[in-house]
Amino acid sequence: MRILGIDPGLARVGYGVIDIQDGCQRMLDCGIIQTNSDRSDGDRMVEIAGDLRQLIRIWRPELAAVEKFFFYRSSNTINVVQARGVVVMTLARFKIPMVEFPPMQIKLAVAGFGHAEKDEVLEAVMRELSLEEPPRPDDAADALAVALTAWLQR
């Protein structure tokens, strides 16, 4: 099974692709879609959709896992919600089933503790995927954790 994990945002969308065969999981790709803050929000969303389409065409995931947010009062909230909408729409266009997980569930599934620190989650991601180097940037590592959660919570 191939899973695309996504950590949505308007400035940076983290992504991670994992493949599971015979119970063994491995990372195929990870990175970020970074948009330029000088561009309009609409142009940034078009860029996210285009880059996500490219990733889907390359890796052909069977499932997508997206980090689910619980927002607090923040001026950035609307931008993240809009970027998430672009992600959901793009996945729907490709008919890719999607699951969502809140941060605490991701931490619990991957690190074994719902209040795990970022470095504990990163260590768990590295261990689960047999990585020698930590995935960078953090958004990509977070997306891999989301993808792993989809596999571990199946």
Swiss-Prot record:
Keyword Hydrolase: yes
Necessary cofactors: Mg(2+)
EC number: 3.1.21.10
Pfam families: RuvC
Residues binding Mg(2+) 1, per UniProt: D7, D139
Location (main, coarse): cytoplasm
UniProt record, GO biological process: DNA recombination; DNA repair
PROSITE patterns in the record: RUVC (PS01321)
InterPro entries linked to this entry: RNaseH-like_sf (IPR012337), RNaseH_sf (IPR036397), X-over_junc_endoDNase_Mg_BS (IPR020563), X-over_junc_endoDNase_RuvC (IPR002176)
Cofactor note: Binds 2 Mg(2+) ion per subunit.
A cellular-component GO term for this protein: cytoplasm
Catalysed transformations (reactions): Endonucleolytic cleavage at a junction such as a reciprocal single-stranded crossover between two homologous DNA duplexes (Holliday junction)
Subunit structure: Homodimer which binds Holliday junction (HJ) DNA. The HJ becomes 2-fold symmetrical on binding to RuvC with unstacked arms; it has a different conformation from HJ DNA in complex with RuvA. In the full resolvosome a probable DNA-RuvA(4)-RuvB(12)-RuvC(2) complex forms which resolves the HJ.
Annotated family: Belongs to the RuvC family.
Role noted for this protein: The RuvA-RuvB-RuvC complex processes Holliday junction (HJ) DNA during genetic recombination and DNA repair. Endonuclease that resolves HJ intermediates. Cleaves cruciform DNA by making single-stranded nicks across the HJ at symmetrical positions within the homologous arms, yielding a 5'-phosphate and a 3'-hydroxyl group; requires a central core of homology in the junction. The consensus cleavage sequence is 5'-(A/T)TT(C/G)-3'. Cleavage occurs on the 3'-side of the TT dinucleotide at the point of strand exchange.
Protein name: Crossover junction endodeoxyribonuclease RuvC
Organism: Synechococcus sp. (strain CC9605)
Gene from which this protein is expressed: ruvC
